């Protein structure tokens, strides 16, 4: 049979155990498919066939699901620079970038032939502009490659591959490693009181967990989820990471570490699980079978984040009480360390307050 015919209903057949009947009860247990991921071309080909066959199977009482898929994600393409030279008939002859020599902005081959840059285009065998994943994984590790691809672009948009930009993802995972690898889990009871700085970090931790949970479950916004985790780690004060940290500071840092490893685990599973085992001393079963729950009460604290801009650019952020008035907020903004450096005692010409 044609592959379109077979693939149009394979989800129902694969859900059932091998038996004499075409479909078993297992199909009704697993269907419909939670998430369909495929290129945009599937929207006018495979999805139409699949929906037709699903309705046919339903009408024949072979399955109960009215629709074959609950959600659809049409992923973008991975792009990379493509290069070519010309044969004797001036036709393009595609070459891999490894063969290209650069000298004073001129591209050539070893034999002296001129090389032309075609720009970013979809990775393909015909244009020889693909990236060998094994080389990248051997150099950076699978987690770094996965993190880079998820962070660089929303999944439904094209991703422009860069051998240099992936270094940023590698450095971030090194930062995570350096923060957690030599620490052990905080095993004491939760403190009864917290300082303002500690409450600010706890607020940030639970706010980030809420954002990331929603990004994964509802929006497929993997890039914004990763950005939120990066922002959380940047928000940890140095004193919380020092050997002299108080019990309450250690507790807040422990919360950051727990949340960070879980939030990264769908994208960087290897380093996340390894660090959790080292950090917690467990076999990892608890890590793989649970997802943390953000504390709504902490998020309902009478606090909000004050965004401080100077000449239209964000220069500072502060978690403050909603009871503070405009004069208090202005004074707080002026005392922000980064803002003070930028102002350098210059007079402020205009203050815009937006509540």
Where are these regions (language model features)?
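Active-site lining segments that contact anionic ligands and/or coordinate catalytic metals
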Residues: 7-8, 69, 142-145, 258, ...
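NTP/phosphate- and nucleic-acid-binding module
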Residues: 19-20, 191, 306-355
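Acidic, turn-prone loop/beta-hairpin segments
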Residues: 72, 78-88, 96-99, 187-211, ...
